[in-house]
């Protein structure tokens, strides 16, 4: 054979092997623990929970920064005006004068919010420059070397004081919610994992049932020729073959759908074919309701949520009461100077003092502000009633969950034993049918019981794991390690 033909054959073979390799998906065996680990790192749900935590973290940092001194600088460099403005003359009449000037100014201030009183204290220094561009082209400087300014509401609500009560609770709620949402990611993973596990098991069951149905149908045709069974039994077994093929097709479609869901949730490549491994090791845990309730009320975001909403309702009442009358004190003390030169603007200096007390008291508002107080109080009563109901529902749901989890191990053991018995019964019935002792109806019943028992076993295993992590989510307690579920929030946020 010529070398050219050898090369063509070799290239064809390589292309065929490459195409086969491309069509074959990489099989990845995955345990429940591995799926949970991947979901907590790669899933969209985990990313959403993390970004919500980051938002809460920076909101809390902003609140804390609002209580610290703030240094500000403002400037106009430069400002220019060429316009007409109204001017009142000595006899009281008005005329228009032309302005044509340039100005520059700068101010440096240190501002401090006073959380105890709700006021604001500022230390300022500033320098202004103005130059007339018409006439004598005079230049003037005005300095304020130092000025201390206080702005203090007298009767209004102290929002800083309320923030000191509400914001730490809000942040604690956000941290607890992040931990709970992480456990909820695990619960979603368990759901998708067992959906895939059950779908794969159903495909295996359907394949075995089809294989058995085809064998029994072949045996039945031979027996029919010998007159040992009726035509009706043969037709029934043929129908079983058709039903088994249809069931296998449906189950294979469900398997592909379940695999796609888990693969997408874990952010894995579509080239990977997942093979879930049935989890055999179970946490040996018995949960006490009162202990679980105490942990939930201490750790869960629900308790912080209740407290925050109570405080916010109280704040709204206080704010409505503060709006009944308003008084503000403004005071400024310092020194100022002005001159044609910068040095002269600082020496000599003169006192610069301002004191103002502003009062706003509604004389006739037809009960509007008092009505706002009544509305705030009524809203607080509504919120308190809802919180009591939510607390009762929370306690009830936790009680039911604890009972379900504690009973689930027994349910799982029963389902496991029933699965083994149903498998053995079906095997025995097949052998009995082969010798003509039972009918096709009995055989179909045994097969159905076998399939249902296997599915029930996997379903009960799913509920055990789901209830366990749901308890972890509500209590934020690791029952195996007997410790709180916690995380280094600072490190997580700053990644």
Language-model regions, residue ranges each:
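Regulatory alphaC helix of protein kinase catalytic domains
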Residues: 23-36
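Acidic, low-complexity, intrinsically disordered peripheral segments
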Residues: 20-25, 72, 79-81, 270, ...
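Bacterial Sec-dependent N-terminal signal peptides
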Residues: 1-26
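A small-residue-enriched
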Residues: 40-155, 268, 293-371, 396, ...
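DHp/HisKA histidine-phosphotransfer helix
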Residues: 45, 163, 233, 302, ...
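Amphipathic alpha-helical coiled-coil segments
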Residues: 48-63, 181, 185-206, 215-217, ...
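Periplasmic alpha-helical coiled-coil/stalk elements that build and connect Gram-negative outer-membrane
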Residues: 30, 164-295, 404, 408, ...
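Interdomain signal-transducing alpha-helical coiled-coil linkers
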Residues: 160, 164, 366-369, 373
């Amino acid at each position: 054979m010529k070398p050219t033909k050898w090369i063509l054959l070799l290239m064809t073979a390589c292309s065929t092997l490459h195409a086969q390799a491309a069509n074959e998906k990489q099989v990845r065996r995955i345990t429940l623990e591995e799926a949970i680990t991947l979901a907590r790192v790669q899933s969209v749900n985990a990313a959403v929970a993390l970004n919500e935590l980051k938002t809460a973290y920076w909101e809390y940092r902003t609140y804390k920064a609002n209580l610290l001194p703030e240094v500000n600088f403002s400037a106009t460099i430069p400002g220019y005006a060429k316009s007409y403005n109204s001017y009142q003359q000595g006899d009281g009449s008005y005329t228009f004068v032309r302005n044509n000037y340039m100005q520059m100014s700068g101010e440096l201030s240190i501002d401090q919010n006073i959380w105890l009183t709700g006021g604001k204290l500022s230390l300022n220094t500033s320098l202004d420059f103005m130059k007339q561009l018409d006439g004598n082209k005079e230049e003037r400087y005005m300095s304020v070397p130092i000025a201390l300014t206080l702005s203090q509401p007298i009767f209004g609500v102290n929002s800083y004081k309320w923030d000191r009560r509400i914001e730490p609770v809000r942040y604690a709620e956000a941290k607890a919610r992040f931990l709970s949402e992480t456990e909820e990611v695990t619960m979603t993973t368990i759901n998708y994992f067992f959906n895939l596990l059950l779908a794969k098991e159903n495909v295996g069951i359907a394949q075995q049932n089809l294989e058995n149905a085809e064998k029994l149908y072949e045996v039945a045709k031979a027996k029919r020729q010998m007159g040992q069974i009726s035509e009706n039994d043969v037709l029934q077994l043929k129908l079983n073959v058709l039903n088994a093929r249809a069931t296998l097709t449906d189950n294979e479609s469900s398997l592909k759908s379940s695999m796609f869901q888990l693969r997408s949730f874990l952010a894995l490549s579509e080239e990977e074919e997942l093979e879930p491994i049935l989890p055999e090791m179970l946490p040996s845990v018995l949960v006490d309701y009162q202990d679980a309730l105490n942990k939930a009320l201490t750790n869960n975001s629900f308790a912080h949520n209740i407290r925050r909403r109570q405080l916010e309702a109280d704040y709204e009442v206080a704010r409505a009461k503060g709006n009944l009358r308003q008084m503000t004190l403004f005071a400024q003390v310092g020194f100022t100077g002005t001159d044609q030169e910068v040095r002269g603007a600082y020496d000599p200096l003169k006192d610069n003092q301002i004191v103002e007390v502003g009062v706003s008291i509604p004389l006739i508002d037809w009960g509007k502000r008092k009505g706002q107080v009544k509305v705030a109080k009524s809203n607080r009563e509504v919120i308190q009633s809802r919180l009591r109901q939510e607390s009762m529902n929370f306690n009830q749901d936790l009680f039911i969950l604890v009972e379900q989890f504690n009973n689930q191990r027994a349910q799982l053991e029963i389902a496991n034993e029933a699965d083994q018995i149903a498998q053995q019964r079906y095997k025995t019935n097949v052998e009995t049918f082969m010798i003509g002792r039972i009918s096709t109806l009995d055989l179909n019943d045994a097969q159905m019981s076998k399939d249902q028992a296997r599915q029930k076993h996997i379903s009960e295993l799913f509920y055990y794991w789901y209830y366990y992590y749901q308890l972890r989510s509500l209590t934020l307690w690791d029952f195996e390690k007997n410790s709180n579920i916690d995380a280094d929030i600072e490190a997580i946020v700053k990644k």
